[in-house]
Amino acid sequence: MEISTREKTLQIVSRYVIITLSISIMTIGVYFFKFPNNFVFGGVTGGAALVAKLTPLSASAFSSGANILLLILGWIFLGRDFAISTGWATVVMTAELALFEKYVPLSGPLSDQPMLDLVFALALPAIASALLFNVGASSGGTDVIALILKKYTHMQNTGEALFITDLAMVLAACFVFDLYTALYSFVGLTVKSLVVDAVLEQMKMCKAILIICDDKDPICDFVMRKLVRGATYTPCYGAYTDRPHYMIYTTLTHREALQLQAFIHKENLNAFISMLSTTEVFGKGFNHA
């Protein structure tokens, strides 16, 4: 089940399309909802909000310099592929922030409802971060520190690592902005960490599938040739009938599981199917320990 050069190219293109779209979603949330309200949930963009408030330096200029330094750390500790994809994300975000500052300047918040702005300032970057983490990239900045922390410590959750690395930035907001903004920022940081973990869990969700059938060949062929996944089978017997059957075990993504279910139904195969949701799958085609 070797992957062809064309398929590898499509995977790379697809990955960078996802990275670009994710960064665009994040930039919209940061520029239109986070910066105008001085929300500081941590990260380089949070630091940029502090710097823009205290100095003449623009948010995009500070983001560029800080991201370059942290990108070097990512290359050293997280690898070349991570650094290249995160570098692309950093370039896209910096360019988009600069374009927004030039062509869509903001003098204040978009609405007079801070809670509404907080929802968008939280949801858009958090969802974008989860999408980036899922394809092995990040938006740069303190996300890099969080991933290094997770890799070299016993932390299991990305959200927990993000919370720890960004907490200092939120505490700084208490001294730079008013207490009202600082409290919003602390709530925002907590919710952001929870949202990132929740979205990542849903995106990593797979189906561990157990199939009892009379004919293993069509099902195994479909899994291996159409879905390009592995499967394991063993002979078994029904307890009530004492008739011989085959038991097939495979692990698929949610979309692939639906395809397999539709195939079995379409071919009218005599099969009993049990699906169990799982988020931790290690091995070829999935995560690597």
Predicted features and spans:
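Positively charged, small/polar-rich N-terminal and surface patches that mediate targeting and assembly
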Residues: 4, 54, 125-127, 151-155, ...
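Core subunits and conserved enzymes of cellular information-processing
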Residues: 2-214
